């Protein structure tokens, strides 16, 4: 009853729902009560302050969105400085085109420029791959050098210094590490790691050899200093010191001397330059081991020879080495010489046997040794050689070699570097003024130009740019005068008298000066009788035995070798010239004159 009367007194009928306004008649009443709770001493509320701060913040943002005059001028100044620095870099780049080569490097890493590399001039950085060769002209700053890729058609540009390459490598490793960490935080990786912990399993640790290998690859320097011109070294068909090998190599040296007259230095090297490994020269503890061993050359002699080869290459002439001790490309793979290995190849062992037997009993008794050496060379992969000469005729082999060397000459002498090399002029003048020397029996004797001083260390000792961490950005040749690499004026101009037109009778050096004494004039010894394809002999000295024209019986065995595709010269521009054909007569041209053209 009371409840009914109470309900009847209400302003709304019982059938209708009670609106919320009954509890809060004014819409602002609820908020006013809450505002009252957060009133400050000054009478303002937190909501008022918040709304005011929103207004102020919006007005500040709208104000700062419009750049001021000082900001615009600062940006313009920055752009002007960038353009001025780029203009100066382009001017220095243009001047460097005619400057001589300071030094050369072989790359151990590749580089492909990206916009974030901060190149002094965008679009002028040099792209290179591992095992490429670079000619460095000068240092631009600590991060960049000026040089060019040794390839036909390539001009000078900016090359990252070892410091720059190391910083790029560290940045790349940091990015990869962050990516691995982010990927390891995913659910799959976390659950798998939890499973490892629960089950007690443990990830296998890499073996010690793998760790050592990884450690060694981390410390490989980005560049190795090499001669400015790669020296040419002949190997094959068998061992040097035996008549067949010496005869065939002598014919090629004769050809090189005449074909590249004025552009090539041919010198004999008697020291065992295979000892000039970077690991040996840079490790004093290994010097004692080498000195105690029964090697034919001391380290001092080896260092002297390496030093001499580097100095000859500074003239940017072709350098050909008649190296007595080099019979396999692996002997020089760990040295700083980076030679052009020319392989004279006789594919058929029977042909080589016939040639060795034709030289007489003194050579036949060493037949097995020579055949074994030839087989070792034949087992090498083609990548170990720069040129493989397996032509049957000497003229074809000579043209094949000349084609490669002409391409290399163009790659190292771009048209932009037209001014003559002052080092070449100085060297040629020194050679012209030198008196006719006596036959050189010991090639290790020093022949210093006037005022020259011997180096304390061989050039091969600092074959790596990375070995001077305090001067990584400074290339050799630009070091202070007290630095071993900075003594350009103290290096020997012509330290061996047999380099230019040396004539030592009875030695292999006579191959460089007397083409008439070459194997191309050799005839058959009458005591042995002419071979199946030999011309009528007679009247020749006994030392000149046999000819390479007596091998027609084995023509069918060599036919499969005639279709070999020659390797394209790595220094040629894209779309090189046609490759010369092969003649069918087997080894006939090796017994004919090649200069009557």
From Swiss-Prot:
Topology in membrane: Peripheral membrane protein
Q: Which domain of life is it from?
A: Eukaryota
Subcellular compartments: Cell membrane, Sarcolemma; Cell membrane
Q: Which residues carry this modification: Phosphothreonine?
A: 499
- Mention one GO molecular function: high voltage-gated calcium channel activity
Which keywords does this Swiss-Prot/TrEMBL entry list?
Calcium, Calcium channel, Calcium transport, Cell membrane, Ion channel, Ion transport, Membrane, Phosphoprotein, SH3 domain, Transport, Voltage-gated channel
Instruction: Read off the InterPro entries from this record.
Output: CAB1-4_N_A-dom, GK/Ca_channel_bsu, P-loop_NTPase, SH3-like_dom_sf, SH3_domain, VDCC_L_b1su, VDCC_L_bsu
Q: Which positions carry Phosphoserine?
A: 44, 47, 73, 186, 193, 547
Q: Which PROSITE patterns match?
A: SH3
Residue intervals of the SH3 domain: 100-169
Q: Where is the composition biased (Gly residues)?
A: 530-540
Q: Which PANTHER family match?
A: VOLTAGE-DEPENDENT CALCIUM CHANNEL BETA SUBUNIT (PTHR11824)
The record's function comment reads: Regulatory subunit of L-type calcium channels. Regulates the activity of L-type calcium channels that contain CACNA1A as pore-forming subunit. Regulates the activity of L-type calcium channels that contain CACNA1C as pore-forming subunit and increases the presence of the channel complex at the cell membrane. Required for functional expression L-type calcium channels that contain CACNA1D as pore-forming subunit. Regulates the activity of L-type calcium channels that contain CACNA1B as pore-forming subunit.
The name this protein goes by in its record: Voltage-dependent L-type calcium channel subunit beta-1
- What organism is this sequence from? Mus musculus (Mouse)
């Amino acid at each position: 009853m009371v409840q009914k009367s109470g309900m009847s007194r209400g302003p709304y009928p019982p059938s209708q729902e009670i609106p919320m306004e009954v509890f809060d008649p004014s819409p602002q009443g609820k908020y006013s009560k809450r505002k009252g709770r957060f009133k400050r001493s000054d009478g303002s509320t937190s909501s008022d302050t918040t709304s005011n701060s929103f207004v102020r913040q919006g007005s500040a943002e709208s104000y700062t969105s419009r750049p001021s005059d000082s900001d615009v001028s600062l940006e313009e100044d920055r752009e002007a400085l960038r353009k001025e620095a780029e203009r100066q870099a382009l001017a220095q780049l243009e001047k460097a085109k005619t400057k001589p080569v300071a030094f050369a490097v072989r790359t151990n890493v590749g580089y492909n420029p990206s916009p974030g590399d901060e190149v002094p001039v965008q679009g002028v950085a040099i792209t290179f791959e591992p095992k490429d060769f670079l000619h460095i002209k000068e240092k631009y700053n600590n991060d960049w050098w000026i040089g060019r890729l040794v390839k036909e058609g390539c001009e000078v540009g900016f090359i990252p210094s070892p410091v720059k390459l190391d910083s790029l490598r560290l940045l790349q490793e940091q990015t990869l590490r962050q990516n691995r960490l982010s990927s390891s935080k995913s659910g799959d990786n976390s659950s798998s790691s939890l499973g490892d912990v629960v089950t007690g399993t443990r990830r296998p640790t890499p073996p010690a050899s793998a760790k050592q290998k990884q450690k060694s690859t981390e410390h490989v320097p980005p560049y190795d200093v090499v001669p400015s011109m790669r020296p040419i070294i002949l190997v094959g068909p068998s061992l040097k010191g035996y008549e067949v090998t010496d005869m065939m190599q002598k014919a090629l040296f004769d050809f090189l001397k005449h074909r590249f007259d004025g552009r090539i230095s041919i010198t004999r090297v008697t020291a065992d330059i295979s000892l000039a490994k970077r690991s040996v020269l840079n490790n004093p503890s290994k010097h004692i081991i080498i000195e105690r061993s029964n090697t034919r050359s001391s380290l001092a002699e080896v260092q002297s020879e390496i030093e001499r080869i580097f100095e000859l290459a500074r003239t940017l002439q072709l350098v050909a080495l008649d190296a007595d001790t080099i019979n396999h490309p692996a002997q020089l793979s760990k040295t700083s010489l980076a030679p052009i290995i020319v392989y004279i190849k006789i594919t058929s062992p029977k042909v080589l046997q016939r040639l060795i037997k034709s030289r007489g009993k003194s050579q036949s008794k060493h037949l097995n040794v020579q055949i074994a050496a030839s087989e070792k060379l034949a087992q090498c992969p083609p990548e170990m050689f720069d040129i493989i000469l397996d032509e049957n005729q000497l003229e074809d082999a000579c043209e094949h070699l000349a084609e490669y060397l002409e391409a290399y000459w163009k790659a190292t002498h771009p048209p932009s570097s037209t001014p003559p090399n002052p080092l070449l002029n100085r060297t040629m003048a020194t050679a012209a003024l030198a008196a006719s020397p006596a036959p050189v029996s010991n090639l290790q004797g020093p022949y210093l130009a006037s005022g020259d001083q011997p180096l304390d260390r061989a050039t091969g000792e600092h074959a790596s740019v990375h070995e001077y961490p305090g001067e990584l950005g400074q290339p050799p040749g630009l070091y202070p005068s007290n630095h071993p690499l900075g003594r350009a004026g103290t290096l020997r101009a012509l330290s061996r008298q047999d380099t230019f037109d040396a004539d030592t009778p009875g030695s292999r050096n006579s191959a460089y000066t007397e083409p008439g004494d070459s194997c191309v004039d050799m005839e058959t010894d009458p005591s042995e009788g002419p071979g199946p394809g030999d011309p009528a002999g007679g009247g020749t000295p006994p030392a000149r035995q046999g000819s390479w024209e007596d091998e027609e019986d084995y023509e069918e065995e060599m036919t499969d070798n005639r279709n070999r595709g020659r390797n394209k010269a790595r220094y040629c521009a894209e779309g090189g010239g046609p490759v010369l054909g092969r003649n069918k007569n087997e080894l006939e041209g090796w017994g004919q004159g090649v200069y009557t053209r």
